[in-house]
């Protein structure tokens, strides 16, 4: 659900003792055997058992393709122990053809969501879709861009910044996308949602035009009273997953099934020579004023006898460097930081938002440190969450990773 490509390879009992290979409703046949593929099918794009050693190349190539293609996500390959020990001739292995969509769609190990995504190819006429958006933009008085994590996932950050600069309208950021623009950015207009801030919600709820880029608008973004979300707005949403455009919690006036990078490339061309209307500037000033007038950290919070977590986050982020990476656990660790953080240009802020499972903080910080080639990482964890993977402190110590850990004792 967080659109992160991942490949999982698990070990399994030998094929002869796999219960799934027999038409008998057994709970278990092999020693410590479990039909893991059935367990994970609903949470993966592709989950399969490698039944033939000669298909290892094809299955691996297919898994890698699906993990990265379209909306990224996890794939799972379960390998029986007799397959693990099998001899193969690399020259005789079958390869996967990513262009043979017909054969790919016949694979029963694809999830329904993956099949839907492949069947509904990106056929939206982007030129006509963009013309309609620009037409509605010209009619609007209070336009807003709602940016989500899909901006970075699609590799569109630079072109996104170019497009939004040309449009010159307020930008609000969705959960796990707050680091797209820093707090001092001239178009920053807050963070909407049930765990957002007042300014961000005011920006969206008073808008009459909303362009959603790379956000699936989950319930925490639109609230449980989703019928009232952006109630005055004409809404256009760009998403690579067609199912996200048809959710019962959304009413989108102009759904666009497209790759965000392709959409933005065309949009920036259409915006050449565009002049920002005065009324759009006026609404941007109003939104910026709301950000100033409705801070997350109120003056009375500082009077608390014990440390208020919002005050702590306010002070912590004021002391961080512009190139720091911040990784949080869930609960108070992420809610207070994602609301109160005054993000500086160049900082990155991460959490696991879809399932929001406890225990993410330490392993997430380790992953962020490795992926950023050893940048300093600030890890914010709850005292319950950190216990779930506390053994990873040894990994941090063993590799001398520059990770600073703050634990909320609540």
Where are these regions (language model features)?
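Internal, active-site/partner-interface "lid" segment
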Residues: 56, 277-292
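Short coil/turn segments at secondary-structure boundaries
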Residues: 76-78, 148, 280-283, 329-330
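N-terminal alpha/beta PP-like core and its mobile active-site loop of ThDP/TPP-dependent enzymes
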Residues: 1-274, 319-322, 402-405
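Conserved short loop/turn motifs at secondary-structure junctions
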Residues: 148-153, 301, 382-384
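Glycine-/acidic-rich phosphate or pyrophosphate-binding loops and their flanking alpha/beta elements
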Residues: 62, 128-138, 312-315, 361-372
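Short hydrophobic beta-strand segments
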Residues: 144-148, 325-329, 383
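Thiamine diphosphate
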Residues: 1-21, 198-218, 332-410
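Active-site diphosphate/adenylate-binding microenvironment
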Residues: 288-363, 368-369
């Amino acid at each position: 659900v967080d659109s992160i490509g991942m490949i999982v390879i698990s070990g399994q009992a030998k094929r002869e003792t796999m219960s799934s290979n027999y038409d008998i409703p057994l709970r278990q046949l092999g020693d410590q055997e479990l039909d893991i593929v059935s367990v994970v099918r609903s949470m993966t794009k592709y989950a399969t058992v490698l039944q033939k050693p000669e298909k290892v190349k094809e299955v691996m190539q297919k898994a890698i393709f699906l993990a990265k293609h379209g909306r990224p996500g996890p794939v799972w390959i379960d390998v029986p122990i007799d397959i693990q020990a099998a001899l193969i001739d690399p020259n005789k292995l079958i390869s996967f053809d990513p262009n043979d969509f017909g054969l790919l769609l016949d694979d029963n190990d694809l999830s329904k969501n993956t099949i839907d995504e492949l069947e509904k190819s990106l056929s939206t006429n982007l030129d006509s879709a963009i013309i309609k958006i620009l037409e509605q933009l010209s009619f609007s008085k209070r336009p807003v861009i709602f940016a989500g994590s899909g901006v970075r996932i699609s590799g569109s950050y630079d072109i996104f910044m170019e497009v939004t600069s040309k449009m010159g309208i307020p930008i609000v950021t969705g959960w796990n996308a707050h680091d797209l623009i820093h707090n001092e950015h001239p178009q920053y207009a807050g963070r909407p949602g049930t765990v957002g801030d007042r300014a961000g919600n005011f920006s969206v709820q008073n808008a009459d035009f909303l362009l959603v880029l790379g956000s699936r608008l989950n319930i925490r973004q639109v609230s449980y009273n989703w019928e009232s979300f952006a109630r005055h707005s004409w809404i256009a949403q760009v998403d690579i997953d067609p199912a996200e455009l048809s959710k019962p919690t959304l009413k989108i006036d102009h759904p666009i099934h497209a790759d965000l990078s392709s959409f933005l490339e065309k949009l920036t061309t259409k915006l050449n020579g565009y002049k920002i209307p005065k009324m759009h500037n006026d609404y941007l000033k109003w939104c910026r004023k709301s950000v100033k007038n409705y801070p997350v950290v109120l003056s009375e919070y500082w009077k608390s006898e014990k440390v208020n977590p919002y005050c702590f986050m306010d002070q912590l982020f004021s002391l961080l460097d512009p190139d720091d990476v911040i990784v949080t656990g869930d609960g108070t660790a992420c809610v207070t930081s994602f609301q109160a953080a005054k993000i500086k240009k160049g900082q990155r802020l991460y959490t696991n938002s879809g399932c929001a499972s406890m225990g993410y903080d330490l392993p997430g910080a380790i992953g962020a440190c490795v992926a950023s080639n050893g940048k300093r990482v600030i890890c914010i964890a709850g005292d319950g969450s950190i216990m779930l993977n506390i053994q990873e402190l040894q990994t941090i110590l063993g590799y001398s990773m520059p990770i600073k850990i703050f634990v909320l004792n609540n």
